[in-house]
């Protein structure tokens, strides 16, 4: 079932249906559906050419020689997967993708990333892949027959954490989006939030709103202004509004450019109205102090 009434706006509607499973007495057509679902999930919805298909593994699954779990394992260990995700990405980004592709969630804390970094360095990539698929977590949610899915985007019951839902939207950028065609490229999406154990803001997926084109400043700050006002108000509490997509002539015609406004609480509402008049999209509102 959907975890939020905003499922259609957040791009999670596709996950309101039951997971794809290879049930007893399955047919060749059922196996074909499972194969396509595994490719979509494990390869991050990246385009797969006919010549790239792992036909020998597909045949083993279709003939009942491989379980769904073992097919997922084989795809994740394949040279195809390594070429798409291991070789071109930073290691922390690879671990984020492994969590997403194999466990259907984002890392919950930095200790999980450190654990997999250590295993990859000391035992190798294949051993690290095994640690996801042979885990009690994988067994509980997917077992031998269910294709992994983004389980933190739907209500699955016990064991879910709110931080997993919000962080999923830094990795999941919409049903039609590919993990190899995102604005942030090969860099980690969650390293900063995990290192500081801070909450992750939800940014709507690609195509849903213009918020998807937002990227935070790499220096952690953005150019500031207050529409000509003083940032001092009657209350000491200030708010930082980070904005993308301002479209007036004096602003650069770059959708990813962002600007920061520091305002007191009393001016928050009027500032938001002015941002709207300027054609901007609010990416985040946080306490400035």
From Swiss-Prot:
* Positions of the CpcD-like domain: 236-288
User: Which InterPro entries does the protein's record reference?
Assistant: CpcD-like_dom, PBS_linker_dom, PBS_linker_sf, Phycobilisome
**What kind of membrane protein is this, topologically?**
Peripheral membrane protein
The record's region (Disordered) falls at 213-233
This protein's major location comes to membrane
The listed locations are: Cellular thylakoid membrane
PBS-linker domain location? 2-180
Q: Which Gene3D superfamilies match?
A: Phycobilisome linker domain
Q: What spans are recorded as compositionally biased (Polar residues)? A: 216-233
Provide the alphabetized UniProt keywords.
Antenna complex, Membrane, Photosynthesis, Phycobilisome, Thylakoid
GO annotation terms (biological process): photosynthesis
Q: What does this protein do?
A: Rod linker protein, associated with phycocyanin. Linker polypeptides determine the state of aggregation and the location of the disk-shaped phycobiliprotein units within the phycobilisome and modulate their spectroscopic properties in order to mediate a directed and optimal energy transfer.
Q: Does the keyword Thylakoid apply?
A: yes
The family assignment reads: Belongs to the phycobilisome linker protein family.
Organism from which the protein derives = Microchaete diplosiphon
Q: Cellular component per GO?
A: phycobilisome; plasma membrane-derived thylakoid membrane
Its protein name is Phycobilisome 39 kDa linker polypeptide, phycocyanin-associated, rod
Task: Give the domain of life.
Answer: Bacteria
């Amino acid at each position: 079932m959907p975890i939020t009434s905003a499922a259609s706006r957040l791009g999670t509607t596709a996950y309101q249906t039951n997971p794809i499973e290879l049930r007893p007495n399955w047919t060749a057509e059922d196996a074909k559906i499972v194969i396509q679902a595994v490719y979509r999930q494990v390869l991050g919805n990246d385009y797969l050419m006919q010549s790239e298909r792992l036909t020998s593994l597909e045949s083993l699954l279709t003939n009942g020689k491989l379980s769904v779990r073992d097919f997922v394992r084989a795809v994740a260990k394949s040279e195809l997967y390594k070429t798409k995700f291991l070789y071109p990405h930073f290691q922390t980004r690879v671990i984020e993708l492994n969590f997403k592709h194999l466990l259907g969630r984002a890392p919950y804390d930095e200790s999980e990333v450190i654990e997999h970094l250590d295993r990859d360095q000391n035992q190798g990539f294949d051993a690290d892949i095994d640690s996801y698929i042979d885990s009690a977590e994988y067994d509980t949610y997917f077992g031998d027959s269910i294709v992994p899915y983004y389980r933190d985007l739907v209500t699955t019951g016990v064991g879910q954490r709110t931080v997993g839902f919000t962080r999923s939207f830094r990795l999941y950028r919409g049903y039609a989006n590919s993990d190899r065609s995102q604005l942030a490229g090969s860099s980690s999406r969650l390293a900063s939030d995990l290192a500081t154990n801070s909450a992750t803001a939800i940014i709507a997926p690609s195509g849903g709103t213009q918020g998807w084109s937002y990227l935070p400043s790499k220096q952690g700050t953005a150019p500031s202004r207050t529409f000509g006002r003083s940032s001092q108000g009657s209350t000491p509490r200030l708010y930082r509004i980070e904005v993308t997509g301002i479209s007036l002539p004096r602003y650069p015609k770059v959708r990813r450019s962002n600007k920061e406004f520091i305002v007191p609480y009393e001016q928050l509402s009027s500032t938001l109205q002015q941002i709207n008049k300027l054609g901007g999209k609010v990416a985040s509102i946080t306490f400035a102090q």
